[in-house]
Amino acid sequence: SKVSPNEIHNHIVDDLIASKNGVIVLGEHLNSNPNSIAITNLISQIALVSDFKIANLTLSGNALSAEKANFIPGENGKDAISMFNDNSKAFLLMGVDCEYDFLDSKLASDCFDIEDVFVISLSSYEGQSVFKNADVILPMASFYETSGTHINFDGLVQSFSASIKSPGESKPGWKIIKVMADLLDLEGFDYVDSTQVKDEALQSSK
């Protein structure tokens, strides 16, 4: 639909034109907007015309890593809402609490509660929603109990080591995925430590 600019919009345009080293900052709320693709494309066009840079602030410190490693829905992929609405029958949740980590927690919970839907949860905590929604819970080491890598806002790769040993039978998330892949006879999961996972992920991002 056609939009008629008001005085505030005109002031923004004037500021953009007057600026020489401008940056358009996008927030996490954009990613949860149903029209995020259209908005992002529009912002990209504005940045191109005005010779501005775009800074995308994310809620998660590792969101850029997921994008760099192509660990996000592709052209034929599905986001969480699409999975819920398309009657998916199996879910693998990794460090996800249904009560807090979905924009529509009721939709997620209702989907997981369907009788023929199977849910595996890799979790570091004994949350009530995890017990309620998961058919199988695999104990996963927390952030402090595993090594790993982030890519920060500036694109800098930051690796870290475990601060403490994980308790009981809990294992790092990558190792749980590796063992599951081995049991399913899947190829490409011959990792010995997290640095190999990091190296392959960074290689795929080039």
What are these regions (language model features)?
Residues 1-206:
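Non-catalytic alpha/beta scaffold blocks inside enzyme catalytic domains
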